[in-house]
Every structure is written in structure tokens, then in C-alpha cells.
Amino acid sequence: MAASKATFRYPVKKPVIPTRVQRWGNGKIPRLRLKKAQCGAVVFRPVAKALDDMFFDALDDGVVLKSLGGGYRDYARQEALWYDRMTLDKAEGKKPLVRRVWQGRTWYLKKMAPVAVPGTSNHGWGLSVDFDLSDPKTYAWLDRHAPSYGFFMEAKPTRPDGDKNPYFEPWHWTKVDA
């Protein structure tokens, strides 16, 4: 039987960006420093090792971890996602309002999931993976086991005041200690 929502821990931890990755810049990591992991995501090479270990252990438990194509994002991809999902028109913004400031202007989320300001995404450091959660067992497995491989979420489903957190992305997991 799948775990109920009440039993989830929603493990959250802020990542530390490795200095060896910072030298290239967000979204500018050389191709030779990236690797395609077993789940299908292209990530920073040290992240791929932990991701592959997690993949095979999940498989042993009957869970197949699959990426939704959400691994490394170069700067151009981050910018394209930004313009696709964000707008300067507050009236077009999705409720509750998700806003970000970029280039001195306030932008509002118009559709889909929140997106980081270009050049600040953990995908741009090759640290994050977006998993396919179409099988409910996948999230339950990640919630329970991913932290032991160094993978955490970046936001909980609710804010401290109990309101829904519009920044919650259950599919988005980041290696915090690459």
C-alpha cells in the first residue's frame, strides 16, 4: 500500500554549489563535465554517480526512476523557459502570484511550474533532476530514500502559515553536496 500524504517528510535542504562548478558559471558547464545518468538526466559528473547508485537501489525496490528531461540546462535553455513561463503583466499571472525579479523588473508566473531566474537555476549547475512522478511509488521512494544519496527538495508543499506553497515542485530534486 502506498504511503499516505501525511506520512511524507518532504526533505528540504539548501544546496552548496561546488567551487569547481562555479568557475564555469551557471548554464556554462563544459559538455565533458556532464554525464547522462541511468534515469536519463544529464548532470554534473559527480552527481551522475550518486544518481546512478540511487537508480539501481530504487530498481531493487521495484521503482524505476525516470527523468522528465529535467537535468542540466544551459543558459539559453533557462532563458527560453523563462520567457515561456513568465510575464511582466501582473494580470496574466497565475494565482497565487509567483513573482521573481530579473533585470530590475518584476515578472509573474503565467503557466506551468515556477522557473528560476536565468543564471540562478540549480539545473544550470548540473545538480538538479526532475523526476517522472506518474507512478505514485516513485515519490514515496524518493521521499524516504533520496536524502541518503544527498538529494533533497527545495521547498515544502505548504508555507509556515499553512498556505499552499506555489514554489513546491515534488518532481524537482537537487544534489546538495556534489
What does each model-identified segment do?
Residues 2-178:
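Cell-envelope/glycan interface and biosynthesis
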